[in-house]
Amino acid sequence: MRKKILAIDDEVDTLTFYSELLDDYNFTPITAENGVEGLKKAREEKPDLILLDIMMPKKSGMKTFKELKNDPDLYNIPVIIITGISKEVDYKSLLNRPSTRGMPPEGHLVKPLTADNLIKEITKVLG
């Protein structure tokens, strides 16, 4: 059975890239254009992994991440955070907040992404 991956990003071109790439690697892609839609799809689809952009309108990636990790039905879904933040210190400060129940994301990628880096990180996180 193909694993389901939910990609949450406000850029349609990025979602298209994810969708095509994930399909090519035998994953079932699910997409959402913002955090509100992403949380809804996570609850409906119960994906095996979530790719989550940090900078989005309506609901930021950090707020979405906090809601995922505080939801008893969703907290165990692994999340790969995708950000433009390249400094490890800045990235860690974003996640060093009690509202995520001390649960860091399972992966982190910095934009711009390559297909190879994305697939390697997904494979690492999914085991």
What are these regions (language model features)?
Residues 9, 53, 83:
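Active-site residues of response regulator receiver
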Residues 16-24:
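Charged docking surfaces used in two-component/phosphorelay signaling
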Residues 31-40, 61:
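Helix N-cap/capping motif at the beta->alpha junctions
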Residues 40, 62-75:
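Short amphipathic alpha-helix used as the core "switch/output" element in two-component signaling
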Residues 45-51:
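Active-site beta3 strand of CheY-like receiver
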Residues 56:
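Receiver (REC) domain active-site loop signature in two-component systems and cognate sites
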Residues 63, 67, 86-109, 116, ...:
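Alpha4 helix (beta4-alpha4-beta5 surface) of REC/receiver domains from two-component response regulators
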Residues 76-89:
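A short, hydrophobic beta-strand element within the central beta-sheet of small alpha/beta folds
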